[in-house]
Regions:
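N-terminal glycine-rich phosphate-binding loop for ADP-containing cofactors
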Residues: 1-261
Length: 263
């Protein structure tokens, strides 16, 4: 049986518990403390975090050996990839259960180490970051999205950001702020859009504007202004980027990040 509710006593009947609250470490730790109290001994306890360190989450329980990450990609009923995340104390049998669950659900389970963003989001972040660089360098969101859908992507990165919500990436960036290398190139365009309340489709505006859920084709002057200001602050003379350059830079960013991953 599958239960989706907050009746904690039902956890005593569960062989596997999956937490799926929003990406806030303190909130997840509090949920796991409650799960630890109510779940039966030997139950597998999983977090659906997409990028947080799962070890502090596991440490909130008295049984970190039973905790692992099961990162389902959104929308979970469609996306095949399932990251099975190994914590420092995760027992081998618990990992085997996670992999078996993925196969049972007809997913593609991939075992990954406990690094920020795991595999999929780490590569995607490198891709998105390069696309943000291209905004500062002279491209517009529609230039980048059109070039990459032309390469075969179902959606471009800025359309994806609007669909999923810009605040998701914003929250992740704020979580990384304390450890970010000050020498690293950082593009604040997304931050400024979020501060202006432009969180994507759900607020009617993000990188693009929307009316009744449909993207407005007209150029968004507000977004153009934010991008032009970002370029000027960095001293960049904007230039047109050909689709081939956009495609090449995006792909090479992903290839480079993949080469740095040690599972």
């Amino acid at each position: 049986d599958v239960y989706k509710r907050q009746e904690w006593e039902r956890l005593q009947q569960a062989d596997l518990v999956i937490e799926a609250v929003f990406e806030d470490l303190a909130v997840k730790q509090e949920v796991f403390r409650k799960i630890d109290v109510h779940a039966r001994p030997g139950a597998v306890l999983a977090t659906n975090t997409s990028y947080l360190d799962i070890d502090p989450i596991a440490a909130a329980t008295s049984r970190p050996q039973d905790v692992l990450g099961l990162h389902f990609f959104s929308p979970a009923n469609v996306m095949k990839l399932l990251e099975v995340v190994r914590g420092a104390k995760t027992a081998p049998g618990v990992l085997s259960t996670g992999m078996a669950l993925g196969a049972t659900l007809k997913k593609m389970p991939v075992l990954t180490g406990n690094a920020f963003g795991f595999i999929g989001n780490r590569i995607y972040n490198a891709y998105r970051r390069q696309c943000e660089f291209m905004l500062e360098d002279g491209a517009w969101p529609e230039d980048v999205d059109t070039a990459l859908t032309g390469l075969g992507f179902a959606m471009g990165p800025f359309a994806v950001a609007d669909l999923s919500g810009l605040d998701i990436a914003w929250r992740m960036r704020k979580a990384q702020a304390a450890t970010r290398d000050p020498r690293e190139r950082y593009v604040s365009i997304l931050d400024q859009l979020c501060e202006a309340g432009r969180l994507g489709r759900k607020t009617g505006a993000g990188y693009y504007a929307y009316v009744d859920g449909k993207q407005v084709k007209a150029i968004d002057a507000t977004v153009r202004g934010v991008i032009e200001q970002a370029s000027a602050q960095r001293g960049i003379i904007r230039r047109a980027l050909a689709p081939e350059e956009i495609q090449r830079r995006a792909l090479l960013a992903m290839v480079n990040e993949l080469s740095l991953i040690h599972i």
